[in-house]
């Protein structure tokens, strides 16, 4: 199972989280986000991490060419799209970045929201399901309706996000079977400031699910 801790802003925390066993670190490249980091920060954080893990850049409604320019200047291995990007947009980005994983995040409000995920099946590598919030794109602390998602089984890998934390992760993964999880606010003291004790507890409770 892929374990992504998103909203990394500090080199020491990034290094510690990678050492604890996370398989991916997420970096927010949306200027309006309280977890926003610049290219220089990403490079400083990733330079401090000796382990081979995924570095995922999170964008929202950015121009594909701008994303391409940022990817060239960083060690980001994946691009996560968290805005209103269309399948056509995703295909265009894939043409520009053929050797990078493209992840499309879907902000789920109701069953119809995740049923519409089918339009992305042929244009991205991975899906991510996050809880809908009218003002925030992510890191809301809101959970999805796990029971309603029980039948969600797309033909490509997917991440579960939305309000996951050490206290609810076992229940979430007992009900659902994603290929990865994405956690941000659930292991924070404040936006961008990770609580390493919470991260360690999360990873401890994930141990029994890691080989699934």
Curated annotation (Swiss-Prot):
- Read off the InterPro entries from this record: Aldolase_TIM, PRAI_dom, RibuloseP-bd_barrel, TrpF_fam
- Which family is annotated? Belongs to the TrpF family.
Q: Which Gene3D superfamilies match?
A: Aldolase class I (3.20.20.70)
Q: Looking at the record's lineage, which domain of life comes first?
A: Bacteria
Reactions the enzyme catalyzes:
N-(5-phospho-beta-D-ribosyl)anthranilate = 1-(2-carboxyphenylamino)-1-deoxy-D-ribulose 5-phosphate
Q: What's the protein called, per UniProt?
A: N-(5'-phosphoribosyl)anthranilate isomerase
Organism of provenance = Microcystis aeruginosa (strain NIES-843 / IAM M-2473)
Q: In which pathway does it act?
A: Amino-acid biosynthesis; L-tryptophan biosynthesis; L-tryptophan from chorismate: step 3/5
Q: EC?
A: 5.3.1.24
Q: Which NCBIfam families match?
A: PRK01222.1-4
Q: Which SUPFAM superfamilies match?
A: Ribulose-phoshate binding barrel
Q: Which UniProt keywords apply?
A: Amino-acid biosynthesis, Aromatic amino acid biosynthesis, Isomerase, Tryptophan biosynthesis
Keyword Membrane assigned: no
Which one of the record's GO molecular function terms can you name? phosphoribosylanthranilate isomerase activity
Q: Which GO biological process entries does UniProt record here?
A: L-tryptophan biosynthetic process
